[in-house]
Amino acid sequence: IDPTNPDTRKYVWQRVKENYVDNGVDLLWFDEAEPEIHPEHFDNLILSLGNGDEVGLIYPYYYAQLVYDGMKEMGRDDIVTLSRCAYIGAQKFGTLVWSGDIPSTFESLRKQVKSGLNMAMCGIPWWTTDIGGFYGGDIESDEFRELIVRWFQYGVFCPVFRLHGSRNGHDRTRDIIEPSGGDNEVGGFGDRGYGI
């Protein structure tokens, strides 16, 4: 979609409203607001404001505005949209940003501290991370058990405390296409982690 085009924003909002908001969903999770394009080169993106390599970074700003304008038109003033990306100024649209699908490593945790500080310095107050990382993390590993405890400790000081991820150690006992992930909460890693 091209959220820089006002007509596109109106069209997409109408679909979102009809399929979600009118059915009681009033907090939306907009993933892939970077935008996610393949191959991953902004020069492959053409927007109404110009070529992607010139204006592509503004994409998440208008992506957030899409929901905000629609909710405002409905008379809402308590608007929050969870988004994987933002642009300076998107905070006025109630954008709650998380850092995306990140690995479950101590290096990634270190980078989240920097990312959170950078977001705050950009004036975007609602920022969070996938506590424990999004992908990886062997639930049987002592290193991962330590990591998730430390990440929970960091998460307490983030503006939004959010746990989300896909862990190794999937439940393959049921005959389903996508098995359930392994434990993803501190309490699932034994008394030591829970006590901390």
Predicted regions and their residues:
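Catalytic-domain carbohydrate-binding cleft regions of carbohydrate-active enzymes
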Residues: 1-196
